[in-house]
């Protein structure tokens, strides 16, 4: 409702014409008393009336009053020795006066004749109001002195005129008696001159005194103005003052908190009397000039904090001092989110300590998840990370070997230099691999190194015009597969040897799968091109089917035709290998502790454990302490590829060493450690705590646990990796095609390797690396493969009928499918009456109309046949007893979990959600 002039005049108890005149005077044009008045018009009218009566404020607030209260406790011991606590409240008040800009502009600043200023910084102990008064007084004194000086100058000029006037008159009079008149005139003139000189000297002295006083007054006024215009220290917050004082503390004597700053103050001697200095808190400096020192306590400088007595020795005094220290502690208002690094295994107590919570909280959460644990229970990494996430913290997977964290750090600052490539020659045994290696050795190894290849080391290097190449001649592919299964990459480039007259064979495909899975570049050497039946184009076509595309077909794999018999193409093959090495930019540190890999190891009856080491970075020297997996030892002897002793080996150089305490496993990483103590510590750590972790890593996926190991809710399709070995090529191809047809957009069959023949150790190692299941169709595993599969937990399935194999894979894929959820309505409940119970909420008295109601069932709340809420039951009772279920026709009482908006006449629809397994 708008306010009119008439209504406003009635509220102000004035007549409407008078109010119209006042509005007109304020610049508000209103024609009649029925015109409306806005809030803006009222504000303008109020300002006009205040200005007219002289009560309007022309500026902002000029004074700000600060009131500070400090509460403290004083502990004193009475005559009986008992300590009592006295509550003390100190109130401090301060008024800040803000100077107006107009007053500051009107002040006339004159350069002083002589500036009398203190050499030290001026420390104000006066209030702003007192300083302003003093500045005004100094200005008035300067003006008064200037006026007095002007008046004295005018009086002096007038007096000189009066002295000179009688002399002139006497000169004008007629001279009756010339001698007497002349003598009298001379005497009077001398007297007048002397009086004038005395008066002038007196006036000059007075003027000099006035000038000195004026200069002093102006200097004082200037100093006061500088003090007032300087930045006020009182605007600094107490927390900032405490922070600055804390920075001045030392390690052994920290800075004193703000609450205890009155214990030690500077003491000055003035006239033999001890007084407090003005070095108090800068916020309350004015009170230091107005009030006397602290409490008088018989010479106690602590202001009475210590009481009348000593307080029971140093311990008591220390407790009193600690009680009065202000720690500035602030209770956190938000939950603290911590970054928790979770290792492979961790106990409940260690996990609680990492999250800074009590162990009972972690145990309670685990009990809610269905696990009964104690504080010493060991949790795996996945469970521990779930606990950390549930408690609102951020979980990070820690590194596996904590003692190994500092290994290899010595070589980080070393210069990285180019190293020779490590090349593995792979292929079918009948395709001339050994002949090709012999040809390379005979062509590139110096005559001084003549002789057969040292078979027990299985590795050597050759020199070419463009650099050196290290070859690994391991028997079969077991070592290469084992290395990839352990996460190591010992090989940089793979030379795939394929016979031009035989084409791609099963072992050739296996080698391709190994290389592609390890991400190692391939150089194809088409051997036996000197034979009449050689067909290089057929080999290229077959390799394209295995995802090995030559460069002339648009791929990235170089194909080099060679002949191990005539030596044709050997130089081109080595040239392409070095070209691939340049593309990879292989570098390693030379002046650093050696790191490498175990190529193969054996137990010699005369030498003990012997291991072939490939140095990957650094330099291995004789006498170094070497750590290989869980075994260690000092290098007692070192042999090169020709069986000759050597003292050191650089990057990409294979050597055979002696001195380890046990035979290491093939593929284990080796590291030079500083001393034996460090090596023993890490070896024992790996043998003990991580034995279970190692076994867990070696567990392959089994058909029975496939659904548990797969990630739930993954967007990408789930894969079932399999390895197929059959008796004949036709059966292997038929089985592979039948299994591939089972793939759907949700689950797919991934054939890691399919071959012909028995199941070998190579197949088991490949299954460990790819977590695959091995299917043997009319083929069996040998003794070594069975033992390796049993140790690593690889699942091997034997079948004689192809349909049985297809049905088993189909069943496994069905288990990997996400189950469907189906709802089934089990009952209907009608709410007859609603009771409100404090601390519980709304309780519904119900009648089961149809079906059955269970305590664990889910419900929907229906109001006028419209679903308004879906949830669970909080409680279900029959009379006063808890009930697990209530059937149709029986009354019961129930409450809903987290919902109280229920009314009489509502209905509850009871349903259960069941999971239905899907099938292909």
Swiss-Prot record:
Residues 149-197, 245-319 are annotated as: Disordered. It is found in: Cytoplasm. The keyword Iron-sulfur does not apply. Residues 418-585 form the tr-type G domain. Residues 527-530 are annotated as: G4. Residues 473-476 are annotated as: G3. GO terms for molecular function: GTP binding; GTPase activity; guanosine tetraphosphate binding; translation initiation factor activity. GTP binds at residues 427-434, 473-477, 527-530. Residues 427-434 are annotated as: G1. PANTHER family: TR-TYPE G DOMAIN-CONTAINING PROTEIN, TRANSLATION INITIATION FACTOR IF-2-RELATED. Belongs to the TRAFAC class translation factor GTPase superfamily. Classic translation factor GTPase family. IF-2 subfamily. NCBIfam families: IF-2, small_GTP. This is Translation initiation factor IF-2. It comes from Polynucleobacter asymbioticus (strain DSM 18221 / CIP 109841 / QLW-P1DMWA-1).
